[in-house]
From Swiss-Prot:
Recorded superkingdom: Archaea
Listed GO MF terms: ATP binding; hydrolase activity; metal ion binding; protein serine kinase activity; protein serine/threonine kinase activity
Protein name, UniProt field: RIO-type serine/threonine-protein kinase Rio1
Keywords attached to this entry: ATP-binding, Hydrolase, Kinase, Magnesium, Metal-binding, Nucleotide-binding, Phosphoprotein, Serine/threonine-protein kinase, Transferase
Record organism: Archaeoglobus fulgidus (strain ATCC 49558 / DSM 4304 / JCM 9628 / NBRC 100126 / VC-16)
Protein encoded by which gene: rio1
């Protein structure tokens, strides 16, 4: 009962755009009191001006739309909230423990989630600085990450898999080349490997955007080469369905600049 009262208290403090109570109900169902407190702190700091609807929900994270402010300008935000209570993060250990940027000694499950949130922010920041097409990261706090919303009118841009047959109406070869160029830039300039790249986490709206950057690793990670090969195979496999022909060895060399 006490936790429920806390949730109601923070929901009262947060501005939620929809007036019919449906969004409020969803917030109460998927977010715990600690996370709502973090959202309120980000709101009090001036980052979030109004929370909007649910973009996606999952075992690891929920993503919401929000109106916000960054560098003194109004922006459309995606608010990614990692679940503190989740067993899914055991699967993420290989991406964390091989990353020299983080000290993983004596880490509790909750702290692991916080480190993962920081890791995604830092990966986005590093990729953006290198010219990779990713959402602009704004800030993070505990298990909450604020970044650029990719879409229009509060509707997220589709992923390549969501485009489905519509992809045939577009310049598939051009989109493929855009993906390859961004993988290349991510590797050569940002010195990162996405490590989970597929049609499920590449958005498209006039150009491609790589998302879900939490698992991305540096080139010094012991599995970086293996992850890169998997990413390249995934890209070739998907685009082959639309008539794009690419050689694995040649593409791998192009990405690595060999």
């Amino acid at each position: 009962m006490k936790d429920l009262k806390k949730i109601e208290s923070y929901l009262d403090k947060l501005r939620i755009k929809e007036k019919d109570g449906e969004e409020r109900k969803i917030y109460a169902e998927v977010l715990d009191g600690r996370t709502l407190k973090t959202l309120y702190k980000l709101s009090a700091k001036g980052y979030i001006t109004a929370m909007g609807g649910v973009i996606s929900t999952g075992k690891e994270a929920n993503v919401f739309y929000a109106d916000g402010v960054f560098d003194g300008k109004p922006v459309a935000m995606a608010v990614k909230i990692y679940r503190i209570e989740t067993s899914e993060f055991d699967k993420m250990d290989e991406y964390l423990y091989g990353d020299e940027r983080f000290d993983m000694r004596r880490i509790s499950p909750k702290e692991k989630v916080f480190i993962w949130t920081e890791k995604e922010f830092r990966n986005l920041e590093r990729a953006k600085e290198a010219g990779v097409s990713v959402p602009q990261p704004y800030t993070y706090m505990k298990n909450v990450l604020l970044m650029e919303f990719i879409g229009e009118d509060e509707l997220p841009a589709p992923t390549l898999v969501e485009l489905g047959r519509e992809l045939k109406e577009l310049d598939v070869e051009g989109i493929f080349n855009d993906v390859v160029e961004n993988v290349k830039r991510l590797y050569q300039e940002a010195e990162l490997v996405h490590a989970d790249l597929s049609e499920y986490n590449i958005m498209y709206i006039d150009k491609v955007y790589f998302i879900d950057m939490g698992q991305a690793v540096t080139l010094r990670h012991p599995m970086a080469e293996s992850y890169l090969e998997r990413d390249v195979r995934n890209i070739i496999r998907f685009f082959s369905k639309y008539g794009v022909k690419a050689d694995f060895e040649e593409m791998l060399k192009e990405v690595k600049g060999e």
